[in-house]
A protein has these predicted regions:
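Conserved helicase NTPase motor core
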Residues: 12-106, 124
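Short, solvent-exposed polar/charged micro-motifs at secondary-structure junctions
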Residues: 21-27, 130-135, 161, 173
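Short acidic-hydrophobic, aromatic-tinged amphipathic segments that line or gate anion-handling sites
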Residues: 163-169
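Conserved beta-strand segments of alpha/beta enzyme cores
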Residues: 10-12, 118, 163
Length: 178
């Protein structure tokens, strides 16, 4: 409350699924979660949702590298409906671990390509020791189609130790961007 005052009373923190269940006036459950984001995006695009229910001034997306096609369609619909809305998408294309369920870093990339967007690389790592960060940079340098171009810098004064026991790239796939 001290940081933003009474504006804290107007902050909503929800997953895409929870937000869409609310928009559709339904109580969410796992069995019905499959198409709820897609349905909400279509309803917004078709003008079937009251504007006051979708008017937002700021949309913050955490773990934006994990957006799916339907998630991106929802964000796009909200952006089209709320032209003045600020979108802050935070993500790391090297950490997309949900591709098996349809997520793709390309949607984070697409947000960086929209009009008036600004791309900021956060390159300072306060969590990992230097040798760990250096090893990750060496590995990531060989990944094609990355969004980031600047190596990460460890802010730690400690070197740390890295041991690679076995590296198998059989099941690693690179994201595709169309």
């Amino acid at each position: 409350m001290q940081l933003i005052g009474n504006a804290a009373h107007f902050v909503e923190i929800k997953t895409f699924h929870s937000y869409c269940f609310d928009l559709l006036g339904r109580v969410g459950n796992l069995d019905e979660a499959g198409d709820v984001v897609k349905q909400a995006a279509e309803m917004i695009n078709n003008g079937e949702v009251e504007p006051n229910r979708i008017s937002k001034t700021v949309l913050v997306i955490d773990e934006a590298q994990d957006m799916s096609k339907d998630d991106y369609a929802l964000v796009s619909a909200l952006m089209k409906t709320n032209e003045e809305m600020r979108v802050i998408a935070v993500g790391d294309d090297d950490q997309n671990i949900y591709e098996f369920r349809g997520s793709n870093s390309r949607y984070l990339y697409e947000l960086t390509q929209t009009e008036h967007s600004r791309f900021i690389e956060m390159t300072e790592n306060y969590r990992s020791l230097r040798h760990i960060v250096d090893t990750a940079n060496d590995f990531a340098r060989n990944i094609r189609q990355r969004i980031k171009s600047t190596p990460i810098i460890s802010m730690s004064q400690e070197d740390g130790e890295v041991r690679i026991v076995k590296l198998s790239l059989i099941h690693i796939s690179e994201p595709t961007r169309h």
